[in-house]
């Protein structure tokens, strides 16, 4: 609200309001004598003498007012001590002038002036005789002036500084104003609001109390009960306060509906925590420091966002509008009505922009009358915005008023009442803001005239006009209470009582009587009456309606534009030229036909949006008002440190769009470099990988740091919040550059050591892991040959990786801590978004343990039968090299040794595949066919052209570990696999194709969401299909199994084969990250890496090393995922949920019968469920994806137990028949190959459980194992009882399993 000079009255009592000293006042000047020429002469004490008195006063007053105004202008446009001193000198002269002329008027005319026949003369004498502060003694007058100066200085120089910093401080204009207008960060808005109210308000309170006492003392001498009574007298109505209350209540329903609608929109933005739909709105969220107008949050509340924007700020900037042009456009509007142009002095002397020469100025927009009938100016720190364009018209309205009444007596050069002066410019702004007018002046390309556009426009106007009404009403309600003595000493309590009562807003932080929040509003310390604005907001719509009628407008009032109507201009001119020479009621009646303030034109103007708001609020079930009026919002987290965080969702959307666009390029280049290296291991390829890793890290850091500028806690859009939280995690890129380079090099060196390693015979024949050692471990039944391969691989790979691993752990932990996690394990577990992940996983493991222990006991007996008692102890752990796999993670390769019914039909399709000439490509074509049979997507041409489906024969070194690749361009997806034509690799092919299908289903999501719902989901999809592929029914359908036998023995054989793959894997997949998590949290140190590894393998798998291992060995490093830093618990999760998926999809496919016989091939309904879940990617929490597939959101082992129920029953019977002991009570047994007699000569070391340890380590180990043994014995006894009852239990039961988050590596293993 422009409230400065344009709203100052020229009569003496308010001349002190011109004192705006922004610097500490200089020493009080010596008393200045008023020039004798300005002293009143001798006049007769009658009406004729009074006429002469008024004429003489007019000429003298113009001189004094010009000098005083010029001094104030000089100070406000260049705040210096010298200008402050000159301003105060001029103010003192003005007060002395007021005193001598006022006292003269009282002495001569007090008995008779109210009986003068001239109404105009009565009005002039009435003004002159009211002295105001000039009634005070000279000492109190100086005290009064000093209080005004200091209050103005405190307000004008107050600043809010950034927390813990002094360099970054914000002034109200433009910094804090812009923050309140544009920020959507709850915490930043709070800091700006609280900072300003503290900085400006608190120091003012004692000064305002003293000012109030002096002001009341002065006006009581003029016959008023207090200052408020004088202010109200300017409206010359005995029922003024009652009229105002009537008007307010007439408008209140419209405000309440607007309030409820806006509150609902703010609730969408800030959520339940900060917005109570039954309470007041926190006062800092409405786009304005005082919540007096809400148009700055229009973007948050716009009814129909698809309609063209009505904020033409961007058009003004694009068209090159500057500040001068804005004022020329406003001037042209006035002249188009036949009103006066601005005089040359206006353009020569006004300050229309904030000076760039370093001067301190008072930026508050104001219009100035220099009382010489030619010099009129505006002071405004204008910015090129639509909002400021309205302010320009408002201020120029004041100047037009000055121009029109400049020939009136100086005492009558004011508005008909104070509200008139504020209304004139705003009347024109009502026309200027219409889409039709904006089109006329080239700021809107098209005028969209439809109902939705009208509602948008009217709501935008309501945010400015209706939202202001209660604030415009309450400010002086509070001050009148202060002046009357009703409010003190509870200034702040009453201020917030009124603001809650009328506005429905509340303070966002605790406020008390040490605060003085009313003082944070310009008009309070600058002693500018405020009820004028409430009056003006009523009047301007009365004026607008009358002028539109005069202009011949037809149609809704809100569409009227009086531009170029000279008839409207003539009517307006009559009001302006009258000044205050006539009662305002007469002037108003001449203008609108009625002499009373009337809210009906305002209600008519907003009628369409009023009805729309009522309907919206009823539809939303919103409560009008704030019944929970005592509610206050909580303090935000991380306040005030997090104030610079951004919660503006529009800005956040732009950020994630840019991140997504750039990420696709960077990730594609990173994937290509890694692919080239993995399919051709060379030094040049290694160098390129490191370059792209650095590029990727830089990208991650750049956007991660940018993402950390967003306040995700206060972003309400779920998708935005989820994306930004993920981008904020810099992962390894959080490391300093040198350490990041070192980290990347360590990973590359470890992975290279793993990938190129080979084990050589004495004759120099060397075997690589793929396919040589893998085939040997799968097919050999020679104890010694298996031992050679097992030991050779670990000696070659593990020992090579060990030197790198401690540093890798250190850097992984450092990166995790830099990302806000406790250690690397904590960071990995965070992907599952579960506070009790470890406990939930343990529960799942315990549910599956009976199945594993029975399988372990059965397989151990079979191995005992094959290898004999010297190699197998029926009550001890199994040597780890005998289970058909380098890591004993799956045992399906020893199926021939453990087959329950050897005479039953064989189900291994490997031989048929070879005999039928299957190739690796044929295997993947078959997998692709399975997916398409479900109605899922076929792989694109790029897949067949670019994948590496076989180990190259050209001598290239490659990483053979099977993996699926997403190149992040929406069309390039590949698999890298050294495929062997056998049944096992056919299953692997389906597993990897499951990853590819997942990639294709979520390819249109933002990059951030192109991951599985949780890491286990991505691993499970292909395996779900493999459960069908493995069934005899499906193998027959693809001609890989000819036998039609499908009896009990075949069922048990099939389930045994599946259990060797699925059940045997459960403890290994569980323990790998149990070990790593403990390494990361330092409960396992580098001195006992290997010892703890084998402790866990013994505890969970019941395995022991076949040869003595020492701490110089590093057997975990012999598993791909350890040197490659790939989290492993995902596989444990995937092996459980794949059975849940299988069970649900089988139901969808209409399968009847045992779960293990289900084949979902060609079921479109099963495919639809899978596709719906995969399309979500990571965009929703994983329970939602689980719900789409299974109909419930939890992870449970029950489906897996159901699947293997027939086998478990058979195993329990078979183990019981042989008297097998479940578990490994002789846990300290080691095979002959691992035994060495006594101590290691000359070393002081001993052999313990196959480990080469210090004697003290061995002693500790013995005690630990004794404790484990007792525990295991108790557990075994309990387990035996449980197993006898388990056959009679219904395994289908609801289980509230863990709820996982997700994160996918670039390569899926």
UniProtKB/Swiss-Prot annotation:
The name under which this protein is listed is Angiotensin-converting enzyme
Q: Which residues bind chloride 2?
A: 794, 1093, 1097
Cytoplasmic topological intervals:
1281-1309
GO biological process per UniProt: amyloid-beta metabolic process; angiotensin maturation; angiotensin-activated signaling pathway; arachidonate secretion; bradykinin catabolic process; cell proliferation in bone marrow; heart contraction; hormone catabolic process
Where's it mainly located? membrane
Which cofactors are required for activity? Zn(2+); chloride
User: Which cysteine pairs are covalently linked by disulfides here?
Assistant: 161-169, 363-381, 548-560, 760-766, 960-978, 1146-1158
Q: Give the UniProt family note.
A: Belongs to the peptidase M2 family.
> Where chloride 1 is bound, by residue?
235, 532
SUPFAM superfamilies in alphabetical order: Metalloproteases ('zincins'), catalytic domain (SSF55486)
Activity regulation annotation text:
The dipeptidyl carboxypeptidase activity is strongly activated by chloride. The dipeptidyl carboxypeptidase activity is specifically inhibited by lisinopril, captopril and enalaprilat.
The signal peptide here is 1-33
Site note Cleavage, residues: 1236-1237
> Per the database record, which ranges form the Peptidase M2 domain?
44-627, 646-1225
Species whose genome carries this gene: Sus scrofa
> What's this chain's function?
Dipeptidyl carboxypeptidase that removes dipeptides from the C-terminus of a variety of circulating hormones, such as angiotensin I, bradykinin or enkephalins, thereby playing a key role in the regulation of blood pressure, electrolyte homeostasis or synaptic plasticity. Composed of two similar catalytic domains, each possessing a functional active site, with different selectivity for substrates.
- Catalytic activity as recorded in UniProt: Release of a C-terminal dipeptide, oligopeptide-|-Xaa-Yaa, when Xaa is not Pro, and Yaa is neither Asp nor Glu. Thus, conversion of angiotensin I to angiotensin II, with increase in vasoconstrictor activity, but no action on angiotensin II; angiotensin I + H2O = L-histidyl-L-leucine + angiotensin II; bradykinin + H2O = L-Phe-L-Arg + bradykinin(1-7); substance P + H2O = substance P(1-9) + L-Leu-L-Met-NH2
What is the free-text note on the cofactor? Answer: Binds 2 Zn(2+) ions per subunit. Binds 3 chloride ions per subunit.
Which Pfam families would you find in this protein's record? Peptidase_M2 (PF01401)
């Amino acid at each position: 609200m422009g409230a400065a000079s344009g709203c100052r009255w020229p009569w003496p009592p308010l001349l002190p309001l011109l004192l705006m000293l922004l610097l500490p006042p200089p020493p009080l000047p010596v008393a200045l004598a008023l020039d004798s020429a300005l002293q009143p002469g001798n006049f007769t004490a009658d009406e004729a003498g009074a006429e002469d008195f008024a004429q003489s006063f007019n000429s003298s007053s113009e001189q004094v007012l010009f000098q005083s105004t010029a001094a104030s202008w000089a100070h406000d446009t260049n705040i210096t001590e010298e200008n402050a001193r000159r301003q105060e000198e001029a103010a003192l002269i003005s007060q002395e002038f007021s005193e001598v002329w006022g006292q003269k008027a009282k002495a001569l005319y007090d008995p008779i002036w109210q009986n003068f026949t001239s109404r105009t003369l009565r009005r002039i004498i009435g003004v002159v005789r009211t002295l105001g502060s000039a009634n005070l003694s000279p000492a109190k007058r100086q005290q009064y002036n000093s209080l005004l100066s200091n209050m103005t200085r405190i307000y004008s120089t107050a600043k809010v500084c950034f927390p813990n910093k002094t360099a970054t401080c914000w002034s109200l204009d433009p910094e804090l104003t812009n923050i309140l207008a544009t920020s959507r960060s709850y915490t930043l808005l709070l800091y700006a609001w609280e900072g300003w109210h503290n900085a400006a308000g608190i120091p003012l309170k004692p000064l305002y109390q003293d000012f109030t006492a002096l002001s009341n003392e002065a006006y009581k001498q003029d016959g008023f009960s207090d200052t408020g009574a004088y202010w109200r007298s300017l409206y010359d109505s005995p029922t003024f306060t009652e009229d105002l209350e009537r008007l307010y209540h007439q408008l209140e329903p419209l405000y309440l509906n607007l309030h409820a609608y806006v509150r609902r929109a703010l609730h969408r933005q800030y959520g339940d925590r900060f917005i109570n739909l039954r309470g007041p709105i926190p006062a800092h969220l409405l786009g304005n420091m005082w919540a007096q107008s809400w148009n700055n949050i229009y973007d948050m509340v716009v009814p129909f966002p698809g309609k063209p924007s009505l904020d033409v700020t961007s058009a003004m900037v694009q068209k090159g509008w500057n500040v001068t042009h804005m004022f020329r456009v406003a001037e042209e509007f006035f002249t188009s009505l036949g009103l006066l142009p601005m005089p040359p002095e206006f353009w020569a002397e006004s300050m229309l922009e904030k000076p760039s020469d370093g001067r301190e100025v008072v930026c508050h927009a104001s219009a100035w009358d220099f009382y010489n009938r030619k010099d009129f100016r505006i002071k405004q720190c204008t910015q090129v915005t639509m909002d400021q364009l309205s302010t320009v018209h408002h201020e120029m309205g004041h100047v037009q008023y000055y121009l029109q009444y400049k020939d009136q007596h100086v005492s009558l050069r004011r508005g008909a009442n104070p509200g008139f002066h504020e209304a004139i410019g705003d009347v024109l702004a009502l026309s200027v803001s219409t889409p039709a007018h904006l089109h006329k002046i080239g700021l809107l390309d098209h005028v969209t005239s439809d109902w939705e556009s009208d509602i948008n426009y009217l709501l935008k106007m309501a945010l400015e006009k209706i939202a202001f009404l209660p604030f415009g009403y309450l400010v002086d309600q509070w001050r009148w209470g202060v002046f009357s003595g009703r409010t003190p000493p509870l200034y702040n309590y009453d201020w917030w009582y009124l603001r809650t009562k009328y506005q429905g807003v509340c303070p966002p932080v605790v406020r008390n009587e040490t605060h003085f929040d009313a003082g944070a509003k310009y008009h309070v310390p600058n002693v500018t009456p405020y009820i004028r604005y409430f009056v003006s907001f009523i009047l301007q719509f009365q004026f607008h309606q009358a002028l539109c009628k005069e202009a011949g407008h037809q149609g809704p009032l809100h569409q009227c534009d009086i531009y170029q109507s000279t008839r409207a201009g003539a009517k307006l001119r009559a009001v302006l030229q009258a000044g205050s020479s006539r009662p305002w009621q007469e002037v108003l009646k001449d203008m609108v036909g009625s002499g009373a303030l009337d809210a009906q034109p305002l209600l008519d103007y907003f009628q369409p949006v009023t009805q729309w708001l009522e309907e919206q609020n009823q539809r939303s079930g919103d409560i009008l008002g704030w019944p929970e009026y005592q509610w206050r919002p909580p303090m935000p987290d991380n306040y005030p440190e997090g104030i610079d965080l951004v919660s503006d969702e529009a800005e956040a959307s732009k950020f994630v769009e840019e991140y997504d666009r750039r990420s696709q390029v960077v990730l594609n280049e990173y994937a290509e470099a890694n692919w080239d290296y993995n399919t051709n291991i060379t030094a040049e390829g290694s160098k390129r990988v490191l370059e792209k890793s650095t590029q990727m890290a830089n990208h991650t850091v750049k956007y991660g740091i940018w993402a950390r500028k967003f306040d995700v806690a206060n972003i309400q859009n779920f998708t935005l919040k989820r994306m930004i939280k993920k981008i904020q995690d810099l992962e390894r890129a959080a490391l300093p550059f040198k350490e990041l380079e070192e980290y990347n090099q360590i990973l590359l060196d470890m992975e290279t050591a793993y990938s190129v390693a080979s084990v050589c015979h004495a004759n120099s024949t060397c075997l690589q892991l793929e396919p040589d050692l893998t085939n040997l471990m799968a097919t050999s039944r020679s104890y010694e040959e298996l031992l050679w391969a097992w030991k050779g691989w670990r000696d070659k790979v593990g020992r090579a990786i060990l030197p790198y691993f401690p540093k890798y752990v250190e850097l992984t932990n450092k990166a995790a801590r830099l990302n806000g996690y406790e250690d690397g394990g904590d960071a990995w577990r965070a992907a599952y978004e579960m506070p009790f992940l470890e406990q939930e996983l343990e529960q799942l493991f315990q549910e599956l343990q009976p199945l594993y222990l029975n399988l372990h006991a059965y397989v151990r007996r079979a191995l005992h039968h094959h290898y004999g008692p010297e190699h197998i102890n029926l009550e001890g752990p199994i040597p780890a090299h005998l289970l058909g796999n380098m890591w004993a993670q799956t045992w399906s390769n020893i199926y021939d040794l453990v087959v329950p019914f050897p005479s039953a039909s064989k189900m291994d399709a490997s031989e048929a595949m070879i005999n039928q000439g299957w190739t690796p490509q044929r295997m993947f074509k078959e997998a692709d066919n399975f997916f398409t049979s479900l109605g899922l997507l076929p792989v694109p041409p790029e897949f067949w052209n670019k994948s590496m489906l076989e180990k190259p024969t050209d001598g290239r070194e490659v990483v053979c570990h099977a993996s699926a690749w997403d190149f992040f361009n929406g069309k390039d997806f590949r698999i890298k696999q050294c495929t062997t034509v056998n049944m096992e690799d056919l299953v692997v092919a389906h597993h990897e194709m499951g990853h590819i299908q997942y990639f294709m289903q979520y390819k249109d999501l933002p990059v951030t969401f192109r991951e599985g719902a949780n890491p286990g989901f991505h691993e499970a999809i292909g395996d779900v299909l493999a459960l069908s592929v493995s069934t005899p029914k499906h193998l027959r359908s693809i001609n890989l199994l000819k036998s039609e036998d499908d009896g009990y023995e075949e069922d048990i054989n099939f389930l045994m084969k599946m259990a060797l793959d699925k059940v045997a894997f459960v403890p290994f997949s569980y323990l790998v990250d149990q070990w790593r998590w403990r390494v990361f949290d330092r409960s396992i140190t580098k001195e006992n890496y290997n010892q703890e590894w084998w402790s866990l393998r013994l505890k969970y798998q019941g395995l022991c090393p076949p040869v003595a291992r020492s701490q110089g060995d590093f057997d975990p490093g012999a598993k791909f995922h350890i040197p490659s830093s790939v989290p492993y618990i995902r596989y444990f999760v995937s092996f459980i949920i794949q059975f849940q998926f299988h069970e649900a999809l089988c139901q969808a496919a209409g399968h009847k019968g045992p779960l293990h016989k289900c084949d979902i091939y060609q079921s479109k309904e099963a495919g639809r469920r899978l596709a719906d879940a995969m399309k979500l990617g990571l965009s929703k929490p994983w329970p939602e994806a689980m719900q789409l597939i299974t109909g419930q959101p939890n992870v449970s082992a029950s489906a897996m137990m159901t699947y293997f129920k027939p086998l478990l029953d058979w195993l329990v019977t078979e183990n019981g028949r042989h008297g097998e002991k479940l578990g490994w009570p002789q846990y300290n047994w080691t095979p002959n190959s691992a035994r060495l007699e006594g101590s290691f000569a000359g070393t002081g070391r001993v052999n313990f459980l196959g480990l080469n340890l210090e004697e003290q380590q061995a002693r500790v180990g013995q005690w630990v194992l004794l404790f484990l043994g007792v525990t295991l014995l108790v557990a075994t006894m309990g387990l035996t009882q449980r197993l006898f009852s388990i056959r009679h239990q219904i395994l289908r039961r609801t289980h509230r399993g863990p709820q996982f988050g997700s994160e996918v590596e670039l390569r899926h293993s």
